[in-house]
């Protein structure tokens, strides 16, 4: 019998809102969020037109709002945010993942958002913490730079993270039956890699 692996996108799939946007709103208020996005509007428009890389736009936004912030203070901010906003995770998703884990299924959340705030949100929401593979943020001289360390966990990188998970567990792809859950273009490759996929689930 094959091992079952359940791979979930985070923002929009498990959550009702974009967690990075909500973190910025939490830290800077709605006015600060809007002003910061307007200051970077050119790059956001270029990204939507596929003329500017998604990961570079993310770096600009993160650097604008959090660049230079002490990493410890940023993690405190993320934990406080998670304490309030773990309820942004869809109840249907919580119930299904809790059930999968209780039955011995393996769950990995593969997220383009940073682990700094996704991890505490998952820890607050679920009975048992799922495996998380998200984007990592660069820290230099003890401060958040706004740059991504390694690769943005988006598109093909999500497949790479799933492969890394399998390699770490010393199990071949052929031994897994993979389920993928996503809601956007960034999940396309992951959903194609899976044996079975679900687009925009948990919305009933």
Regions found by a protein language model. Give the residues of each.
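Generic detector of well-ordered alpha-helical segments enriched in charged/polar residues
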Residues: 21-25, 39, 59-63, 74-79, ...
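C-terminal cap/substrate-recognition subdomain and adjoining C-terminal extension
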Residues: 1-5, 76, 83-204
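A structural signal for alpha-helix termini and helix-coil/disorder junctions
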Residues: 29-30, 47, 51, 67-68, ...
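Metal-dependent phosphoesterase signature
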Residues: 57-92
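Active-site neighborhood of HAD-like aspartate-dependent phosphohydrolases
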Residues: 1-50
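Alpha-helical structural motif
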Residues: 16-19, 57-58, 70, 158
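Short, charge-rich amphipathic segments
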Residues: 23-33, 47-60, 88-101
